Curated annotation (Swiss-Prot):
CDD domains named in the record: AdoMet_MTases (cd02440)
Compartments it resides in: Cytoplasm
Organism per entry: Hahella chejuensis (strain KCTC 2396)
Role summary: Specifically methylates the guanine in position 1207 of 16S rRNA in the 30S particle.
Domain of life: Bacteria
EC class of the enzyme, as a word: transferase
Gene: rsmC
Protein family membership: Belongs to the methyltransferase superfamily. RsmC family.
Pfam families membership: MTS (PF05175), MTS_N (PF08468)
EC code: 2.1.1.172
Protein name, UniProt field: Ribosomal RNA small subunit methyltransferase C
UniProt xrefs under Gene3D superfamilies: Vaccinia Virus protein VP39
Listed InterPro entries: DNA_methylase_N6_adenine_CS (IPR002052), Mtase_sm_N (IPR013675), N4/N6-MTase_EcoPI_Mod-like (IPR002295), rRNA_ssu_MeTfrase_C (IPR023543), RsmC/RlmG (IPR046977), SAM-dependent_MTases_sf (IPR029063), Small_mtfrase_dom (IPR007848)
HAMAP family in the record: 16SrRNA_methyltr_C
Length: 342
């Protein structure tokens, strides 16, 4: 089971109780679906993670993406496994999405790492009159068995957050975010200093990598209305947020899922990004390092990269190794904004 994450390994310890049709909600990006299929169960997947969906393809009967924030009203499974989301506030969203199917399920599981809050989530549900029983602990994870109260209804919450951003040189932006999307409900400091430090950009094709709610992409389109602006993310809730941000501001943005730069076609004139370097509660620079390696393929000769990062991370060495000489456009006690031309 070396290809399985700790939560998946903990869940598979329950294989003696797994049968029939199972819905995996927000599973890790690993081989959990394929492992379950080998036990004879029929697996469906509901996920907002582009990478996890790709990992499950070929091993599932059905898949849904959290794009419409709803399941068919008649959707039914024998068992439902809720994998603890990396952002804790997403659990309420997940429960709201699967609510129509919960009453039909014979068994509901909650699985996750202790440090990602699975125990506190289970105890919170218990305070809301759920029957929550811890059935296993392994691999620094816990597995809980859940039963909702007979009169349970999902929280009435449209889950959208909105805020405005006033900037120089462009109109005030209306920004929309869903739970778990980076910089949800407010502009983070890193993106703020990046936008304030942007150099003059050249070319017709601009890319916002790891777009979150779309604030960078929308700003670029306002500043360069003739440019084609692309926004990518692996979080499908981020893409939904960015699409709504585009609509609210009357701008046309090309928003699509991409695992790093894998789905981005070559010929980009400029990449502007506050790149992701956290996976759940762990710091992880692998995504950014792979992104920088791929920049040479995606950027045109003479194309540029503008990037904000925590100042303690060794971005200059990585950027120079894969893109070109680095200039520091801005720095303070927390962040640096780097610019390089291929």
């Amino acid at each position: 089971m070396s290809q399985l994450s700790n939560p998946s390994q903990a869940f598979l310890r329950q294989r003696g109780q797994l049968s029939g049709r199972i819905l995996l909600c927000s599973p890790p990006a690993d081989a959990i679906a394929a492992e379950l299929r080998q036990t004879g169960v029929e697996v469906s997947v509901l996920s907002w993670d582009h990478t996890a969906v790709n990992a499950c393809r070929g091993a599932v009967a059905e898949e849904w993406l959290f794009t419409d924030l709803a399941l068919p009203a008649d959707a039914q499974w024998d068992q439902i496994a809720l994998f603890m989301p990396k952002a804790r506030e997403l659990l309420d969203l997940m429960l709201s999405v699967v609510a129509p199917a919960l009453k039909h399920a014979q068994h509901i599981w909650l699985v996750g790492e202790k440090r990602e809050g699975v125990e506190s989530a289970a105890k919170r549900l218990a305070k809301e009159d759920w029957d929550a029983t811890k059935v296993d602990s392994a691999r620094h994870c816990q597995v809980w068995s859940l039963t909702p109260p007979a009169d349970w209804k999902p929280k009435q919450n449209d889950f959208w957050r909105a805020y405005e951003l006033a900037q120089e040189k462009v109109d005030t932006l209306q920004l929309f975010t869903l739970p778990g999307v980076f910089s949800a409900g407010r502009l983070d400091e890193g993106t703020e200093v990046l936008l304030q430090s942007l150099p003059e950009l050249h070319g017709r094709r601009l890319l916002d990598f790891g777009c979150g709610c779309g604030v960078i992409g929308a700003t670029l389109k306002k500043r360069y209305p003739k440019a084609s602006v692309e926004l990518t993310d692996i979080n499908l809730l981020a893409l939904k947020s960015a699409a709504r941000t585009a609509e609210a501001n009357g701008v046309e943005l090309n928003v699509y899922a991409s695992d790093g730069l894998a789905e981005v076609q070559p010929g980009v004139d400029a990449i502007i990004t506050n790149p992701p370097f956290h996976q759940g509660v762990k710091q992880d620079t692998r995504v950014t390092q792979q992104f920088l390696r791929d920049c040479a393929r995606v950027l045109k000769p003479g194309g540029s990269l503008t990037l904000v990062a925590n100042r303690f991370l060794p971005y200059p060495d990585w950027i120079e190794a894969h893109v070109g000489p680095v200039r520091v456009l801005f720095e303070n006690s927390r962040f640096k904004v780097y610019h390089a031309v291929r």
